[in-house]
C-alpha cells in the first residue's frame, strides 16, 4: 500500500517544485552513474569522456538544488563560508560544488591529486565522510519527494512531526559542515590560499594604494575625473606610484623592506631584491626629482631636462674622476707593487672649502682605483708649518671592510633626503676644532711635511689599512667639508632631519637653501662626491651620548662669519691610519708622533669601529679621557649611526654609477614599471580586487541627473571670453578688445520712452544673473520732423546681448516654431530700418546714436562679429544714404545658450559617458552636448548670422537645418553674402 502511494505521488516532469526538481535531477545522475559502471572506460575512452562530462553536469545540478533546500530548511544554521574571501576569483565558479563532489569521490576511491600525495592522503578520510553523508542526504530527499511533495509549490511542505523530517534536518547540517571543511582543504591543496597574515597584508596593500591615490590627487599627478570615470590608465599608474610611496613616503608600511621576506605581501615578495635596490636609489633623489619620476610613471612622457632639478641632485663625476672597470685590477696590482700611497698630503689654498673640494676629489679617485694619479694641485707645495685641522681622513670605498655590510635601513625620521655621503674629510677654521686661547699654538701643534709621507710608503700594510678605512668608522663626530651648514649648527635638541617627504608643500625646496649652497660652493668644478657628503651629513642625526657619562655631548661651536672667513694660513691634510687586527681580536691604535697635541681624541670600540670626537677639550684632559673611552664599551647609538653612514656610502656609490640624473630617472622608471606591470600578470585577481576597492573608496559622490531646461532663460546665459590668441590674431593688435563687440538681440528689445532735452542721457542696462554680461546701446529716436537739436527726443533702449565667443555658450533652448521665427524676423527688419533712419538723421550730432555708431565701427575689429558683420557694414556704408529696400539686411537671432559641461556627463543622443578621450561637443543649433560621433555634421546657420558651416548634431541637421534650408534660406544666405561683398 505504501509503495502504491509512492507511485501515485511521484513528481511529474512539468513539476517546478524543489523536491520534484531534485527528484528528476537525482534520477538522471543515477542513470549516468549506472552507465559508467556498466563498461570498461579504458576500452571506450571517448564514450567514457562523454559520460564523465554528463556526470559532472548532473552533479552540479543536484548539488545546486540541494543547496537551495538547505537554504530554506537550515537558514542561519548553515556552516559559515567566510574563507571564500581568500580564494582567487577564478576558483569561485558556479560549478565549484560539482568539482568538489567529483574530487571527493576520486579521493574516496583511492586516487590522489597529482603532485599532492601528502595532501591527498590527509583529505581522504574527509572525502569519504563527505560522499557518505551526501549519499544519505540523497536517500532522505528522495523519500520526501515521494511523501510530502506539493506540485509546483514554491516552498517546502514537510511534516515537522515526522521523524524522517527531523532526520533530514540533522543530515543536512552534517553534510553542510563536512562539505565546507572539504571545500577549504581541497581548494587550499589545489591553489595557493592566503593565510590570515597574508590576507591582512593584502588589505594593507589596498590601504597603501588608496593613500597613494589620495596623495597623487593632492599634488596634482592625477585628476578626480579619472577616478570617477574608472580610467583604465589608473590600473597602471596607481601600482607604480604605490611602489614609490611604499618605499619612500610610507617607509614603515607594507613595503618596508627591512622586515623579513616571509612577512612581506606575497604580491611583492618575489621582487624583494630589486625593490631594495630601487629604495636605495629613491633615497638619493630630492623632492623635485622624485616628483619628476612620479610624473613620468603616470604619463610615460619624456623627462623634461629643461626644468632645473633640485639643489641636492648629483651630477656625473668629471672625466678625471672616472675609472675604467677593466683596469681596476691592474691598477691595484701596480699600486701594491710600487707602494704608492692611497692618499697624499695636499697643501691647499687659504680657503678651507677649496681644501675640502680637492680632498674629496682625491677620495673619489681612490674609490675609482686611480691610485697612480695623486692630487698635486696645491698652489704652494713648499709651504712649511701648515696647520692641520682635521688629521683624520676617511676612505670612500664602502665595500672594502666588513663594516660596510648591508645594514638595516634607518627609520623615516633618520632617513636620507636627497643624497648620501660619499666621504667625510675637511680642514676647517680654528673655531671648529680648538679653543680661542690655543690659537697661537696651532702652528706648532702638528707639523707634517713630505718626508713623513715618504716614510710611510715603506709600510705596505699601512697602505692597505688606508684603503680599508671607511666613513662608517666615525661614530661620535664628523669631519665635514663646508661645515657652514644650517642644520649642523642647530642645537642637539633640534632635529637635524625630517622625513624623506615631510610634506608635499616642501616639494621643490626653498630658494634660500639653494642660494646658500651656491655661496658655499666657491669652486665651480665641485665633485659629485663632495656634494653627496655635504648633503647627507646635513641630514644625519648625531646620536646623544647619554650612555657615556664621562663623555660630554658632541657640539659644534662656530659662527657663519668664522665659517666663511679665510684662514690666512695654508693647511695640509694628512691621512691618519688606524690598524685593525682581526686575527688576534684586539685593536692597535696607530698614533702619530705629534698626536698628543691633537685637539680631539680617538676612541676604539669592541667591534673594531673607530670613533672620532668633535669635542673641544683642553690638552690636559685629552689623555685621561682617551683612556676612559678605551675602557668603555661600544654603545648602540654608535652602531646605529655607523650603519647610517655605511648605508649612505652604499647609496651614493650606487648613484655615481649613472651618467646623469635623467639616466637615473629613466632606469628607475623601467624598474618600477616592470615590477608594477608584472603584478598585472602574476597577481591579476588580487590586483583587480584591490583596485576595485580603491576606486570605490575614492570616487566622488554620485553626480546629479542632467537637468536640461525646456526653455532658455536669458538670465541663465553664461559669459565666455575669447582666448588671447583670438584677440591678438584677429584684432590685429587693436586697442578695442573683443569684449567691446556688441550684437542686437531682438528677443530682448524693450523700447521705452524717456524724457529728453537736447541730449538723452545714456544708460546701460545689464539683464541676467551673475553668469551673464549684456552690453546695451542707448539709442535716441526723434519724434516728428524736427532737428535732433531742437525737437524733443524720445530715447529708446534696446538691449544688446552678445555671447562672448561663438563656441562657448552653455544653456539649452528649444527650437522656435516657424511662425514665431517669421514674426521675429519681420519685427527685427522694421527695427533695423528705424535704427538706420535715426543714425542717418543724426550724423555729426552729439547724440547717443553717434556713440553707438562709433562703438559699432570699433566693433568691426572684433573677431566675433561674423554673425552681424553684414548688418554692421551696411551701417557704416550707409552712414549718409538710406537703404534701398529692407530685404537687403539680414535678420539674425540670438544663438541658443549651451548646456554646461558639468551638467552633461553623457552624450544626449547615445548616452555614452564622456571620458578624457571622449570629448564634449556642443551643437550650434540646439546647444546640446554630444559626442564626436553624434555631432559630426556641419551646416551654416543664417538665422544666427553664421554663414559658415558650423558643428550641429545629427537630429538638428536632419530635422531643422535641412528642412529649414529651403528657398528662403538660400536667398537669405545669398543676400547676406552679396551685402557683405
UniProtKB/Swiss-Prot annotation:
SUPFAM superfamilies: FYVE/PHD zinc finger (SSF57903). Zn(2+) 2 binds at residues 923, 926, 953, 956. GO terms for molecular function: zinc ion binding. Residues 760-791 have a biased composition (Polar residues). Residues 434-462 have a biased composition (Acidic residues). Keywords: Metal-binding, Phosphoprotein, Zinc, Zinc-finger. It holds the Pfam family FYVE. Zn(2+) 1 binds at residues 907, 910, 931, 934. CDD domains: FYVE_LST2. Residues 326-356, 369-380, 390-404, 412-433, 630-642, 811-866, 883-896 have a biased composition (Low complexity). Residues 308-462, 561-642, 749-897 are annotated as: Disordered. The keyword Zinc-finger applies. A zinc finger (FYVE-type) spans 901-961. PANTHER family: LATERAL SIGNALING TARGET PROTEIN 2 HOMOLOG. Belongs to the lst-2 family. Negative regulator of epidermal growth factor receptor (EGFR) signaling. This is Lateral signaling target protein 2 homolog.
Amino acid at each position: 500500500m505504501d509503495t502504491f502511494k509512492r507511485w501515485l505521488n511521484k513528481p511529474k516532469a512539468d513539476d517546478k517544485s524543489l523536491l520534484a526538481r531534485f527528484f528528476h535531477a537525482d534520477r538522471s545522475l543515477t542513470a549516468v552513474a549506472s552507465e559508467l559502471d556498466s563498461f570498461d572506460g579504458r576500452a571506450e575512452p571517448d564514450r567514457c569522456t562523454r559520460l564523465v562530462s554528463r556526470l559532472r553536469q548532473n552533479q552540479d545540478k543536484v548539488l545546486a538544488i540541494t543547496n537551495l533546500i538547505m537554504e530554506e530548511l537550515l537558514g542561519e544554521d548553515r556552516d559559515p563560508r567566510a574563507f571564500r574571501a581568500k580564494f582567487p576569483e577564478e576558483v569561485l565558479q558556479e560549478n565549484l560544488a560539482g568539482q568538489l563532489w567529483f574530487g571527493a569521490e576520486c579521493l574516496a576511491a583511492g586516487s590522489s591529486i597529482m603532485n599532492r600525495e601528502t595532501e591527498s592522503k590527509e583529505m581522504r578520510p574527509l572525502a569519504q565522510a563527505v560522499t557518505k553523508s551526501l549519499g544519505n542526504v540523497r536517500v532522505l530527499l528522495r523519500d520526501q519527494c515521494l511523501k510530502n511533495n506539493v506540485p509546483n509549490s514554491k516552498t517546502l511542505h514537510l511534516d515537522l512531526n515526522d521523524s524522517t523530517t527531523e532526520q533530514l534536518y540533522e543530515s543536512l547540517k552534517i553534510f553542510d559542515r563536512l562539505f565546507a571543511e572539504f571545500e577549504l582543504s581541497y581548494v587550499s591543496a589545489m591553489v595557493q590560499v592566503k593565510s590570515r597574515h597574508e590576507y591582512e597584508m593584502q588589505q594593507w596593500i589596498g590601504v597603501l594604494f588608496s593613500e597613494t591615490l589620495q596623495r597623487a590627487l593632492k599634488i596634482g599627478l592625477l585628476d578626480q575625473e579619472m577616478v570617477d570615470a574608472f580610467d583604465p590608465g589608473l590600473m597602471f599608474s596607481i601600482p607604480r606610484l604605490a611602489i614609490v610611496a611604499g618605499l619612500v613616503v610610507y617607509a614603515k608600511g607594507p613595503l618596508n623592506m627591512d622586515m623579513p621576506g616571509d612577512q612581506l605581501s606575497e604580491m611583492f615578495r618575489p621582487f624583494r631584491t630589486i625593490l631594495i635596490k630601487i629604495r636605495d636609489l629613491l633615497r638619493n633623489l630630492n623632492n623635485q626629482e622624485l616628483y619628476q619620476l612620479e610624473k613620468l610613471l603616470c604619463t610615460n612622457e619624456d623627462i623634461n631636462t629643461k626644468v632645473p632639478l633640485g639643489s641636492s641632485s648629483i651630477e656625473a663625476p668629471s672625466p678625471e674622476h672616472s675609472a675604467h672597470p677593466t683596469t681596476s685590477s691592474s691598477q691595484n696590482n701596480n699600486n701594491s707593487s710600487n707602494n704608492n700611497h692611497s692618499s697624499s698630503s695636499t697643501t691647499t689654498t687659504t680657503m678651507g672649502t677649496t681644501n675640502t673640494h680637492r680632498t674629496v676629489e682625491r677620495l673619489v679617485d681612490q674609490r675609482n682605483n686611480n691610485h697612480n694619479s695623486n692630487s698635486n694641485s696645491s698652489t704652494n707645495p713648499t709651504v712649511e708649518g701648515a696647520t692641520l685641522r682635521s688629521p683624520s681622513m676617511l676612505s670612500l670605498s664602502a665595500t672594502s671592510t666588513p663594516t660596510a655590510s648591508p645594514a638595516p635601513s634607518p627609520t623615516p625620521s633618520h632617513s636620507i633626503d636627497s643624497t648620501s655621503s660619499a666621504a667625510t674629510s675637511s680642514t676647517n677654521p680654528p673655531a671648529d676644532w680648538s679653543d680661542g686661547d690655543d690659537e697661537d699654538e696651532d702652528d706648532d701643534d702638528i707639523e707634517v711635511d713630505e718626508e713623513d709621507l715618504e716614510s710611510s710608503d715603506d709600510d705596505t700594510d699601512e697602505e692597505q689599512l688606508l684603503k680599508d678605512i671607511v666613513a662608517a668608522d666615525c661614530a661620535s663626530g664628523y669631519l665635514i667639508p663646508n661645515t657652514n651648514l644650517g642644520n649642523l649648527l642647530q642645537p642637539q635638541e633640534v632635529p637635524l632631519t625630517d622625513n624623506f617627504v615631510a610634506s608635499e608643500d616642501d616639494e621643490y625646496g626653498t630658494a634660500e637653501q639653494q642660494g646658500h649652497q651656491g655661496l658655499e660652493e666657491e669652486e665651480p668644478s665641485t665633485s659629485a662626491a663632495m656634494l653627496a657628503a655635504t648633503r647627507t651629513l646635513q641630514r644625519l642625526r648625531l646620536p646623544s651620548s647619554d650612555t657615556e657619562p664621562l663623555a660630554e655631548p658632541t657640539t659644534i661651536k662656530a659662527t657663519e662669519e668664522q665659517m666663511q672667513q679665510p684662514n690666512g694660513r695654508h693647511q695640509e691634510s694628512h691621512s691618519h691610519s688606524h690598524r685593525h687586527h682581526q686575527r688576534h681580536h684586539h685593536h692597535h691604535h696607530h698614533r702619530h708622533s705629534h698626536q698628543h697635541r691633537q685637539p680631539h681624541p680617538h676612541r676604539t670600540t669592541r667591534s673594531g669601529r673607530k670613533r672620532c670626537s668633535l669635542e673641544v677639550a683642553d690638552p690636559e684632559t685629552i689623555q685621561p679621557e682617551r683612556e676612559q673611552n678605551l675602557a668603555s664599551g661600544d654603545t648602540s647609538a654608535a652602531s646605529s649611526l655607523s650603519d647610517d653612514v655605511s648605508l649612505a656610502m652604499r647609496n651614493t656609490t650606487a648613484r655615481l654609477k649613472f651618467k646623469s640624473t635623467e639616466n637615473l630617472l629613466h632606469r628607475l622608471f623601467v624598474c618600477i614599471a616592470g615590477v608594477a606591470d608584472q603584478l598585472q600578470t602574476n597577481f591579476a585577481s588580487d590586483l583587480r580586487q584591490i583596485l576595485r576597492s580603491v576606486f570605490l573608496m575614492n570616487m566622488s559622490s554620485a553626480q546629479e541627473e542632467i537637468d536640461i531646461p525646456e526653455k532658455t532663460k536669458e538670465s541663465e546665459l553664461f559669459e565666455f571670453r575669447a582666448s588671447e590668441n583670438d584677440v591678438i590674431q584677429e584684432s590685429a593688435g587693436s586697442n578695442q578688445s573683443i569684449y567691446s563687440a556688441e550684437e542686437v538681440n531682438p528677443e530682448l528689445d524693450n523700447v521705452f520712452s524717456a524724457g529728453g532735452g537736447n541730449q538723452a542721457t545714456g544708460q546701460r542696462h545689464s539683464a541676467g544673473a551673475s553668469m551673464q554680461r549684456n552690453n546695451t546701446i542707448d539709442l535716441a529716436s526723434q519724434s516728428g520732423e524736427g532737428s535732433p537739436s531742437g525737437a524733443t527726443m524720445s530715447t529708446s533702449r534696446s538691449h544688446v546681448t552678445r555671447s562672448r565667443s561663438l563656441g562657448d555658450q552653455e544653456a539649452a533652448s528649444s527650437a522656435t516654431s516657424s511662425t514665431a521665427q517669421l514674426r521675429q524676423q519681420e519685427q527685427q527688419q522694421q527695427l533695423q530700418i528705424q535704427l538706420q533712419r535715426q543714425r542717418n538723421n543724426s550724423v555729426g550730432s552729439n547724440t547717443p546714436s553717434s556713440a553707438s555708431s562709433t562703438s559699432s565701427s570699433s566693433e568691426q575689429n572684433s573677431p566675433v562679429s561674423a554673425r552681424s558683420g553684414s548688418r554692421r557694414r551696411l551701417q557704416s556704408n550707409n552712414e549718409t544714404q538710406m537703404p534701398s529696400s529692407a530685404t537687403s539686411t539680414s535678420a539674425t537671432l540670438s544663438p541658443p545658450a549651451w548646456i554646461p559641461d558639468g551638467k552633461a556627463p553623457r552624450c544626449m543622443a547615445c548616452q555614452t559617458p564622456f571620458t578624457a578621450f571622449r570629448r564634449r561637443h556642443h551643437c550650434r543649433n540646439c546647444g546640446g552636448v554630444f559626442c564626436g560621433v553624434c555631432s559630426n555634421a556641419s551646416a551654416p546657420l543664417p538665422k544666427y548670422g553664421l554663414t559658415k558651416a558650423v558643428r550641429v548634431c545629427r537630429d538638428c541637421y536632419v530635422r531643422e537645418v535641412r528642412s529649414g534650408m529651403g528657398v528662403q534660406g538660400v536667398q537669405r544666405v545669398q543676400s547676406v553674402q552679396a551685402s557683405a561683398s
